[in-house]
Amino acid sequence: MMTNLFSVFDPSAIFNLSLNWLSTFLGLLMIPSIYWLMPSRYNIFWNSILLTLHKEFKTLLGPSGHNGSTFIFISLFSLILFNNFMGLFPYIFTSTSHLTLTLSLALPLWLCFMLYGWINHTQHMFAHLVPQGTPAILMPFMVCIETISNIIRPGTLAVRLTANMIAGHLLLTLLGNTGPSMSYLLVTFLLVAQIALLVLESAVTMIQSYVFAVLSTLYSSEVN
């Protein structure tokens, strides 16, 4: 049962090639529409969202943030949001439900922040290990806690996104598997429940994309 349940996340292979990972790059097909002479309502709406995110990330980074650094996190938000939404459609592979992708995004970002911070702002990074107002007797204990919490950051970023994507898809799969054994009346309620769950899953895709980008921005602001 568990093997069949999680099989929706298995990358299928054709000629020993995992072609369904190519769904990650389907967003490239939408880029040419940005350069139309007359932008569509979708482009105007999307640009307004990106402008709002740019202002918010700029505020989080503070005056010490480098020019153009917000575009990294806006691109990260766009990539995750697109892949989350594509995973809601039938027969499209959900790449963000795999740690292969989420760790590939979180770990290099965290490593870059840490290397930049420890090389250029060493005293500032040491100061972060001891919260202000900590009693002297608790300082060694707090250094251990802060060090561990810093090390597990990329893991929590990746696992949070992956777990949320897996949970919603598993619920939809479980409900769908019970459909053939139900009566017509119960199937009607099942469809209503699945539609409601799909709406909630759509909200989760947006929230998790935003959380991933905001936390990455906050981690970046700590090393400046």
Curated annotation (Swiss-Prot):
Membrane topology category: Multi-pass membrane protein
InterPro entries given for it?
ATP_synth_F0_asu, ATP_synth_F0_asu_AS, ATP_synth_F0_asu_bact/mt, F0_ATP_A_sf
Q: Which UniProt keywords apply?
A: ATP synthesis, CF(0), Hydrogen ion transport, Ion transport, Membrane, Mitochondrion, Mitochondrion inner membrane, Transmembrane, Transmembrane helix, Transport
A single Gene Ontology MF term assigned here is: proton-transporting ATP synthase activity, rotational mechanism
Q: Where in the cell is it found?
A: Mitochondrion inner membrane
**One of the protein's GO biological processes:** locomotion
Q: Membrane spanning segments where?
A: 17-37, 72-92, 99-119, 125-145, 155-175, 184-204
Q: Which Pfam families match?
A: ATP-synt_A
Annotated signal sequence range? none
Q: What is its main location?
A: mitochondrion
Q: Which cysteines are joined by disulfide bonds?
A: none
Q: Among the entry's GO cellular component annotations, what is one?
A: mitochondrial inner membrane
Q: Which NCBIfam families match?
A: ATP_synt_6_or_A
Q: How does it assemble?
A: F-type ATPases have 2 components, CF(1) - the catalytic core - and CF(0) - the membrane proton channel. CF(1) has five subunits: alpha(3), beta(3), gamma(1), delta(1), epsilon(1). CF(0) has three main subunits: a, b and c.
Q: What does this protein do?
A: Mitochondrial membrane ATP synthase (F(1)F(0) ATP synthase or Complex V) produces ATP from ADP in the presence of a proton gradient across the membrane which is generated by electron transport complexes of the respiratory chain. F-type ATPases consist of two structural domains, F(1) - containing the extramembraneous catalytic core and F(0) - containing the membrane proton channel, linked together by a central stalk and a peripheral stalk. During catalysis, ATP synthesis in the catalytic domain of F(1) is coupled via a rotary mechanism of the central stalk subunits to proton translocation.
The Swiss-Prot or TrEMBL record describes its family as follows:
Belongs to the ATPase A chain family.
Indicate what this protein is called per its UniProt record: ATP synthase subunit a
Q: What gene name is listed for this protein?
A: mt:ATPase6
